[in-house]
């Protein structure tokens, strides 16, 4: 893993303390304790965050939703530099136990991937950003206790899944990660009104991705299958609104649902 521009090992002082304490307690930390390593074809892997200090730049995205494009680019680059520095630290810093450091150095960037961006992915994975506050904001209860909807356009079933959102220092001199949740849900219905604006604000807009949902609800709804469900319904609803000369908030919901069923929507 190459040394990133502006690399400063002090940025990973907490990681060094964590590794030192793990050694003191007799814990054996390997690569799979530092990150999720999912095998892929051709001896490659897909990695993801795992453990208290990993590939997530905790708290670094806090200002992203309200930021202008220049600030978003800066936040984007900060995430890139964090991940690059994290891997470089594990592969090179003397604070890392030899066993772990040697294991990390058995891996590297895939030489045939992302060749025009120095083998790093082209795009930041943005789980959440700015969302509409419309006619109906879906919340945790809509996933767990109020799972049926009269204006349902489809179903969701993915866990409420959020990584940590902040790291809080304590008076005792430690830190606490906050925000991680992995809560199973039973299949629930998705409300059409979650993607319609308030009627007094706009009558000809449907929002199938940045729809109205709380952080907890969006942690399940944000998956690509749900985006496709919203998009399918949005297309049919837009056509109906145009042909019927009505605002999107006043379309015939049973007629929309009938069309969706006829097109094998669930």
Protein language model annotation of sequence segments:
Residues 1-266:
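Flavin (FAD/FMN)-binding glycine-rich loop and adjacent Rossmann-like elements that form
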């Amino acid at each position: 893993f190459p040394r990133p521009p502006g690399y400063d090992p002090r940025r990973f002082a907490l990681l060094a303390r964590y590794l030192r304490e793990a050694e003191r307690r007799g814990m054996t930390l390997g690569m799979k304790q530092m990150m999720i390593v999912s095998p892929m074809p051709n001896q490659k892997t897909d990695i993801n965050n795992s453990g208290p200090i990993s590939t997530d730049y905790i708290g670094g995205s806090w200002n992203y939703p309200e930021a202008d494009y220049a600030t978003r680019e800066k936040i984007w680059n900060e995430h890139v530099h964090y991940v690059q520095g994290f891997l470089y630290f594990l592969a090179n810093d003397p604070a890392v136990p030899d066993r772990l450091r040697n294991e990390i150095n058995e891996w590297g960037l895939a030489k045939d991937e992302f060749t025009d961006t120095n083998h790093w992915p082209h795009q930041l994975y943005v789980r959440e950003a700015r969302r509409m506050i419309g006619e109906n904001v879906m919340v945790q209860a809509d996933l767990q206790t109020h799972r049926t909807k009269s204006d349902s356009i489809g179903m969701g079933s993915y866990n409420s899944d959020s990584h940590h959102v902040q790291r809080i220092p304590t008076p005792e001199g430690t830190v606490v990660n906050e925000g991680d949740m992995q809560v199973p849900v039973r299949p629930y219905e998705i409300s059409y009104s979650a993607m319609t604006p308030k009627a007094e604000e706009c009558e000809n807009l449907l929002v199938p991705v940045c729809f109205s949902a709380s952080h907890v609800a969006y942690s399940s709804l944000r998956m690509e299958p749900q985006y496709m469900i919203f998009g399918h319904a949005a297309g049919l609803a837009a056509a109906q609104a145009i042909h019927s000369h009505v605002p999107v908030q006043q379309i015939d919901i049973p007629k929309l649902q009938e069309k969706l069923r006829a097109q094998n929507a669930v």
